[in-house]
């Protein structure tokens, strides 16, 4: 159990740092499009979780430390529903209703599509 906790913690740090770096880069280069970082990490995270899920279905012998570390730790640290919610609220509060609705729709449906695509890649 300790090894699983360590794997989740270490991978979570990596995912969180990648999300932070993505947000910092987008803020520095495209401050008007602050929501793009959250959208990007969430869609990429969905793709990654689809691939990992598919791989782990094919390889059930992969140790729990690796499975939990990658899915719960790395992908959990990388993706964020709370930032998505805040970004959407900020867009709504600034009167950008069509953009907020588009962002929410792309986030949800794009995430589902990316997860499906990731899983499908493991079935080729």
Curated annotation (Swiss-Prot):
Binding sites annotated in the UniProt record for Na(+): 76, 79
Primary site of residence: membrane
TM stretches of this protein: 5-25, 38-58, 69-89, 99-119
Disulfide bonding pattern of the chain: none
Keyword set, alphabetical order: Cell inner membrane, Cell membrane, Ion channel, Ion transport, Membrane, Metal-binding, Sodium, Transmembrane, Transmembrane helix, Transport
Coiled-coil region list: none
Membrane topology per record: Multi-pass membrane protein
Domain of life: Bacteria
Gene Ontology terms describing biological process: cellular detoxification of fluoride
Keyword Transmembrane helix among UniProt keywords: yes
Catalytic reaction annotation: fluoride(in) = fluoride(out)
GO cellular component: plasma membrane
Record localization: Cell inner membrane
UniProt entry tagged with the keyword Ion transport: yes
Pfam family, one: CRCB
Function summary: Fluoride-specific ion channel. Important for reducing fluoride concentration in the cell, thus reducing its toxicity.
UniProt similarity note: Belongs to the fluoride channel Fluc/FEX (TC 1.A.43) family.
Protein name: Fluoride-specific ion channel FluC
Originating species: Pseudomonas syringae pv. syringae (strain B728a)
């Amino acid at each position: 159990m300790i090894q699983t906790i360590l794997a989740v913690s270490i991978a979570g740090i990596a995912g969180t740092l990648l999300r932070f770096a993505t947000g910092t880069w987008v803020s520095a280069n495209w401050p008007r499009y602050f929501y793009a970082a959250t959208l990007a990490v969430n869609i990429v995270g969905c793709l990654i979780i689809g691939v990992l899920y598919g791989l782990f279905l094919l390889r059930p012998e992969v140790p729990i430390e690796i499975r939990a570390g990658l899915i719960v730790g790395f992908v959990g640290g990388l993706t964020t529903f709370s930032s998505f919610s805040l970004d959407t609220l900020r867009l709504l509060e600034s009167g950008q209703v069509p953009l907020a609705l588009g962002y929410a729709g792309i986030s949800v449906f794009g995430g589902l599509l990316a997860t499906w695509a990731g899983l499908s890649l493991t079935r080729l």
